[in-house]
Amino acid sequence: MQGSVTEFLKPRLVDIEQVSTTHAKVTLEPLERGFGHTLGNALRRILLSSMPGCAVTEVEIEGVLHEYSTKEGVQEDILEILLNLKGLAVKVEGKDEVIITLNKSGAGPVVAGDITHDGDVEIANPEHVICHLTDDNAEISMRIKVERGRGYVPSTARIHTEEDERPIGRLLVDATYSPVDKISYAVEAARVEQRTDLDKLVIDMETNGTLDPEEAIRRAATILAEQLDAFVDLRDVRVPEEKEEKPEFDPILLRPVDDLELTVRSANCLKAEAIHYIGDLVQRTEVELLKTPNLGKKSLTEIKDVLASRGLSLGMRLENWPPASIAED
């Protein structure tokens, strides 16, 4: 089999071996040499870190104020109960968060199947043990908040945002949202006709039961394809930053000379020379102003001092003066 150097083999055989409802092996072959590790490592990382799922994030247990306590009639302490609740495999349809409840009395184990929930919630491991009640008079009641998310979010990451509103007795739980429990891959040799240097990728995956292994592979491949799609067309798609339009002139130059609060004599002399704006004034030199009728050295000194207090001076050069907004007036 000899193809173009620009053509790459695509897997023609995809085999899914369903070991159990939560365990599957997916085999893809043939792959070009090296592509087994390239694709296997990328899919493995996505499956571990980027699969959305649901997890317990908050718990309220009747009669319990903090996690470092115990409850009468319950074999486990509160920390151990919270640890067991982290192992709940919950699937929620159509909602980002739900509240489920657990009420149990009498001696014996308390399991996930004892939890009360509506039709939007499915518990994939109903036999999962949460705690044990030690006598017939013992009882436990709790409200459990389940949220949708991705990856791992420790409870400490939510303390600063929720502490002010969180009432006493509401316990935070580290949330592991990923439905994938274990994932590994192996690359084996594959052969197509005379070629014996090809790869076969075998992905071995276990989930918590809320996500089918085949669907997990499909989602991971979709995420990878969407991320790589940006590299197909390398045009610069950045939104150009809007540059702030700097005014052509300092706003103070556009203000009328009346704003300088000069004496009546000085102000009248400037108006007689058609000097209406501060921008008009700063372009005049001392010699030019002294030629103005009735404007003497005392008035000149006043004008210079007032301009200096505003960071201006006489004899300035202003390109493109006057601006259109003034010229139209």
UniProtKB/Swiss-Prot annotation:
The keyword Chaperone does not apply. InterPro entries: DNA-dir_RNA_pol_insert, DNA-dir_RNA_pol_RpoA/D/Rpb3, DNA-dir_RpoA, RBP11-like, RNAP_asu_C, RNApol_insert_sf. Gene3D superfamilies: 5' to 3' exonuclease, C-terminal subdomain, DNA-directed RNA polymerase, insert domain, RNA polymerase, RBP11-like subunit. It comes from the Bacteria. One of its GO terms (cellular component) is DNA-directed RNA polymerase complex. Belongs to the RNA polymerase alpha chain family. This is DNA-directed RNA polymerase subunit alpha. The lineage of its organism: Bacteria, Pseudomonadati, Pseudomonadota, Gammaproteobacteria, Vibrionales.
